[in-house]
Regions:
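Active-site Tyr-X1-5-Lys
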Residues: 1
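C-terminal substrate-binding subdomain of Rossmann-fold SDR/epimerase-dehydratase oxidoreductases
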Residues: 4-118
């Protein structure tokens, strides 16, 4: 939104989730608290995307091309693919993300445009 350059590392994959889905899950802890338990909360496994795909979705949502993007083969000292198992949160906290990355990115861009007037 601010026309600042950024770097995308090829081959890196992530699963993102929308804040509304995460907050709904965390709110369920109130009624389902189990002391000492740890939970992973993220989007659905089938939403895993290459970082470049997420970048392309964002660029599309803001109506920009990739001229400000530098593509690099690998980021040093990091895990290329970060897969998250949310099965325990699904079982204990009724975690059930509904907002796809495409919709979540669109909503986030709209929110940022409204709140930051960009």
């Amino acid at each position: 939104l601010h026309d600042k350059p950024y770097t995308v590392f090829k081959g890196h994959k992530r699963i993102i989730d929308f804040v509304e889905d995460s907050c709904r899950t965390w709110a369920n802890i109130v009624d389902n608290f189990i002391p000492g338990e740890v939970y992973n909360v993220a989007g659905k496994p089938e939403w895993e995307r290459d970082i470049k795909q997420y970048s392309d979705l964002i660029l599309k949502a803001i109506g920009k091309d990739d001229s400000l993007v530098t593509y690099e083969e690998a980021e040093p000292f990091t895990t290329k693919i970060k897969t998250i198992d949310c099965s325990k949160a699904e079982r204990d906290l009724n975690h059930n993300p509904k907002i796809t990355p495409e919709e979540g990115i669109k909503r986030t861009v709209e929110w940022m445009r409204w709140n930051y007037r960009v």
